Amino acid sequence: MIEFGNFYQLIAKSPLSHWLETLPAQIATWQRDQHGLFKQWSNAVEFLPELTPYRLDLLHSVTAESETPLSEGQLKRIDTLLRNLMPWRKGPFSLYGINIDTEWRSDWKWDRVLPHLSDLTGRTILDVGCGSGYHMWRMIGAGAHLAVGIDPTQLFLCQFEAVRKLLGNDQRAHLLPLGIEQLPALNTFDTVFSMGVLYHRRSPLEHLWQLKDQLVKDGELVLETLVVEGDENTVLVPGDRYAQMRNVYFIPSALALKNWLEKCGFVDVRIADVCVTSTEEQRRTGWMVTESLADFLDPNDHSKTVEGYPAPLRAVLIARKP
């Protein structure tokens, strides 16, 4: 059973304490409405051993090592339980010699984002749409005091809790199975990340306002999303699908997105990075065995999706709440 009591205790004496007015009731509702496979996934987490790493590297990767190697039987059991939580999309993780080779090389994204961030040391961070929580561990490695992730996908919660259990039940990062629309205006986080979320929102400007409502004054927003080439008036609104995804609504140019942020009241907005997504960064692996990016691109022209739209191009924008 995945519990949230430790998080409630953690924030009770922090600037996030007012969240406790609504959060426990929301979690209780979520616990009543769990997905049919959730029990199977949570059992996999429960059966994992709680291991405390002898060496833990969150600065350069997410790598845990033991002082003495685990037995072949222990490794096989852990590997089997972790594979019960497939597909693994965001990572990679190296846990006591088990290498979870995820669909996405999320470490590459982190390497692109990190040089543009304000120092994370001592910061309280919100990661919206955090997936398995990979980037939260990297935030902790970069010095963050607390990383809170929200993602309503129940499998991602179980993946996060599995990794946490193998990292000595580390309490510096927490994942809550909520969407951004379920959060009150907390105005508490020093840094808010929204990476790979905006294009899934039917109302992208509303999403930007929701992100702003979570930041303290002078807090920093890190926004990473799909963009298209073009001027400040360019926005792609795909038809039924984009790269086989049905839930893609608005893909602006980086310049248009900068304007959107400024319209929502952000200042010091800058385009930090623009990068084509490669089939080396997102691909099928032994831990994610279904279709991936190569299957979503035109086989004769990788500059286009199978629907004929421009292939995925991703931008990182940094902004400040005044």
Swiss-Prot record:
What is a single molecular function from GO for this protein? Answer: transferase activity, transferring alkyl or aryl (other than methyl) groups
Kindly indicate where the leader peptide sits in this chain.
none
Could you name the domain of life of the organism this protein comes from?
A: Bacteria
Q: Which reaction does it catalyse?
A: carboxy-S-adenosyl-L-methionine + 5-hydroxyuridine(34) in tRNA = 5-carboxymethoxyuridine(34) in tRNA + S-adenosyl-L-homocysteine + H(+)
Q: Which UniProt keywords apply?
A: Transferase, tRNA processing
Keyword Hydrolase part of the UniProt annotation: no
Q: Report the EC number(s), separated by commas if there are several.
A: 2.5.1.-
Q: Its GO biological process terms?
A: tRNA wobble uridine modification
Residues holding carboxy-S-adenosyl-L-methionine: K90, W104, K109, G129, D151, P152, T153, I180, E181, M195, Y199, R314
Instruction: State the function annotated in the UniProt record.
Output: Catalyzes carboxymethyl transfer from carboxy-S-adenosyl-L-methionine (Cx-SAM) to 5-hydroxyuridine (ho5U) to form 5-carboxymethoxyuridine (cmo5U) at position 34 in tRNAs.
Q: Which family does it belong to?
A: Belongs to the class I-like SAM-binding methyltransferase superfamily. CmoB family.
Q: How does it assemble?
A: Homotetramer.
User: Matching PANTHER family, A to Z?
Assistant: PUTATIVE (AFU_ORTHOLOGUE AFUA_2G14390)-RELATED, TRANS-ACONITATE 2-METHYLTRANSFERASE-RELATED
Q: Which HAMAP family does the record cross-reference, listed alphabetically?
A: tRNA_carboxymethyltr_CmoB
**What is this protein's record name?**
tRNA U34 carboxymethyltransferase
Q: To which species is this protein native?
A: Citrobacter koseri (strain ATCC BAA-895 / CDC 4225-83 / SGSC4696)
- Underlying gene: cmoB
